[in-house]
């Protein structure tokens, strides 16, 4: 495998799991490129742009959280998050078979307790399989309106969506206020994560699934008991 050296800051993020993060970086730089999951030009910035950017979500989750990473692709952000926060439970949801095969190979090789589920987050069968989650993460999967609809569908009441976004995050929120509200998303805001080791920090859109006390319950259902 191609060796991709981590930056000095990576040790503070991954601790004694840094060797596992290094091995994952090597997977991305070799099999990930060969299978079209990572562009060949991305290998020189795998750590900052992909792994550390994803691990930055660890600042915004709580111990014991059940986390679904939707449209996981090459395992971003789910695998770095699981490595940085071994006290959470991560499920990777990915519709494409070849990507699921890659994810399963990586998870098995790293020996981490991460579940891989093939399917789409909006599929009722997938929702039944994974159950209601505390947190739903995503990265480069779709527009904010779609992400909110998919995420709210598998979140428990009060659960949170954490969507890694770019410079237009605030504008996306404003453009999609009505759709977000219809999806049952409340308390929508932008977070900056990883400021101690990323320049610029990761931009994350956070939203909560409404509860009967602060808005609508599950989208499409009455919140009355």
Swiss-Prot record:
Indicate which residues the UniProt annotation says bind S-adenosyl-L-methionine: 71, 76, 121-122, 139
Q: Where is this region: Disordered?
A: 204-225
For the protein in the UniProt heading, the enzyme class is transferase
- The UniProt record lists the EC number as 2.1.1.-
- What are the GO cellular component annotations? cytosol
Q: What GO molecular functions are on record for this protein? A: rRNA (guanine-N7-)-methyltransferase activity
UniProt xrefs under Pfam families: GidB (PF02527)
General function of this protein: Specifically methylates the N7 position of guanine in position 518 of 16S rRNA.
What PANTHER family does this protein map onto? S-ADENOSYL-L-METHIONINE-DEPENDENT METHYLTRANSFERASES SUPERFAMILY PROTEIN
Please identify the protein, giving its name as recorded.
Ribosomal RNA small subunit methyltransferase G
Q: What is the lineage of its organism?
A: Bacteria, Bacillati, Actinomycetota, Actinomycetes, Mycobacteriales
């Amino acid at each position: 495998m191609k060796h991709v050296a981590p930056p000095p800051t990576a040790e503070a993020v991954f601790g004694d799991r840094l060797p596992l993060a290094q091995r994952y970086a090597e997977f991305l730089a070799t099999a990930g490129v060969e299978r079209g999951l990572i562009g060949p030009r991305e290998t020189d910035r795998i750590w900052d742009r992909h792994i550390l950017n994803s691990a930055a979500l660890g600042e915004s989750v709580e111990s014991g959280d059940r986390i679904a990473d939707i449209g996981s692709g090459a395992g971003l952000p789910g695998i770095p998050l699981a490595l940085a926060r071994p006290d959470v439970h991560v499920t990777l949801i990915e519709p494409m078979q070849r990507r699921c095969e890659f994810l399963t190979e990586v998870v098995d090789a790293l020996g981490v307790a991460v579940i891989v589920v093939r399917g789409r987050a909006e599929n009722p069968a997938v929702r039944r399989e994974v159950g209601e989650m505390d947190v739903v993460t995503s990265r480069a999967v779709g527009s904010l309106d779609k992400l909110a609809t998919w995420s709210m569908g598998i979140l428990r009441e009060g659960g949170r969506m954490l969507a890694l976004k770019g410079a237009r995050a605030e504008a996306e929120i404003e453009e999609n206020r009505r759709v977000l509200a219809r999806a049952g998303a409340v308390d929508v805001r932008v977070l900056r994560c990883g400021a101690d080791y990323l320049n610029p920090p990761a931009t994350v859109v956070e939203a909560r699934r409404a509860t009967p006390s602060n808005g609508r319950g599950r989208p499409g259902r009455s919140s009355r008991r």
